Design a protein with these regions (language model features):
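A long amphipathic alpha-helix within ATP-dependent nucleotide-binding catalytic cores
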Residues: 226, 239-299, 338-348
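C-terminal structural cap/anchor segments
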Residues: 282-344
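ATP-dependent carboxylate/phosphate-activation module, predominantly the ATP-grasp catalytic core
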Residues: 217-270, 308-333
Length: 349
């Protein structure tokens, strides 16, 4: 059975929409087009990577060959010709399933409606609350889910510097950091719009960040397995900025140097994922975490900032460092036309 990888970064937006007929905005479609080969870093040798039909097979083959990636590009309309295959998108949602069915791919190789319902349900940010609760709320302040503008306003006035997060969002999208609750005239409209579209907001106390990182996992046969670590920097609104590319052992040692009790906590998180997610989901999974300064000036751990039931940028950087022997920094740089795929390699210095 052949492996087929596919980049659909609009996945989080499609989850928020919920139905199978979501149309991504132009910036998301451009992002998907320009970084179409990104999963090739994660894919095992002799896999396929599905690309838009208007892209050149020859050009993408040269790009992959120049980076010593033994991956074959194939137009999405031709994936059905592969026959028996295992499809690995950036993330599964109803829209992608519908698109692949329209491309002639057998439903035997796609998740069922019930499986997609579980993915959407577990991709809700309240899953992070369940993980905190499974760990006994023993580490950092737990997010709270609020459903009215009045309750959200009360929270942000009590916690200046807090984060308001839409339930279905990722990679820093759908997040509002409230620095001045009384002087920010935009935030009330943002709250009303978010509650209207998604029904609730996850509200989090702002923490004095030391380092963002994640554990990168795969769920298979009812069990979550640790694949590696990613260390990254994010901006003011928690959007991905850059990722560190290094061997897994080096990243692990760096994190242990800042927080020596990390490994037992990761074990507890994996047990929570085994209970909460793995019985209902097979695929890639990333758990974002954060080291921060506590009120006593010590480094503390937030063991679950968010859970992503999909592939992540951290999986890309982890594979670059551990499997492909690269070291440096991974950054996606916007060009005038969008996000230039050629800049992936140029940023590894």
């Amino acid at each position: 059975m052949k492996d087929v990888y596919l980049f659909n970064p609009e996945h989080d937006l499609a989850l928020a929409h919920g139905a199978h007929n979501y149309t991504a905005p132009p910036f998301a479609r451009q992002f998907r087009h320009d970084l179409r080969l990104l999963p090739a870093w994660v894919a095992p040798a002799d896999s396929y990577i599905a690309i838009p039909d208007d892209c050149s097979i020859d050009e993408d083959s040269r790009w992959l060959h120049d980076r010593h990636l033994d991956i074959t590009p194939i137009h999405i309309s031709k994936v059905a010709d592969v026959g028996s295959c295992c499809i690995h998108p950036w993330g599964w949602d109803a829209t992608l399933r519908y698109q692949l069915l329209q491309a002639g791919i057998s439903p035997d190789y796609l998740p069922t409606d019930e499986q997609l319902d579980w993915i959407r349900r577990l991709s809700h940010r309240r899953t992070s609350i369940a993980v905190h609760e499974a760990l006994g709320n023993a580490f950092s302040p737990c997010p709270v889910e609020l459903t009215t503008a009045e309750d959200v306003a009360a929270f942000m006035h009590s916690h200046p510097g807090c984060y308001l997060k839409m339930p279905w969002s990722g990679s820093g999208k759908g997040i509002y950091r409230v620095i001045d609750p009384t002087g920010d005239n935009h935030v009330p409209r943002w709250i009303e719009g978010a509650l209207h579209r998604q029904g609730s907001l996850l509200c989090e106390v702002g923490l004095d960040r030391v380092q963002d990182f994640a554990i990168e996992c795969i769920c298979r046969d009812g069990h979550a397995m640790l694949m590696g670590y990613s260390v990254f920097d994010s901006d003011f609104h928690s959007q991905f900025g850059s990722g560190r590319v290094a061997p897994m052992e080096a990243l692990h040692e760096m994190l242990l140097g800042m927080y020596s009790d990390l490994d037992p906590v990761i074990g507890q998180v994996l047990m929570a994922i085994d209970d909460l997610i793995a019985p209902h989901y097979n695929g890639y999974l990333g758990i974002d975490m954060m080291l921060y300064w506590d009120k006593n000036g010590r480094i503390a751990l937030n063991p679950c900032v968010e859970v992503n039931l999909r592939m992540t940028m951290g999986m890309v950087t982890a594979a670059m460092g551990s499997r492909h022997g690269l070291q440096g920094s991974f950054t996606i740089v916007a060009s005038e036309s969008g996000h230039d795929v050629e800049l992936q390699q140029n940023q590894l210095k």
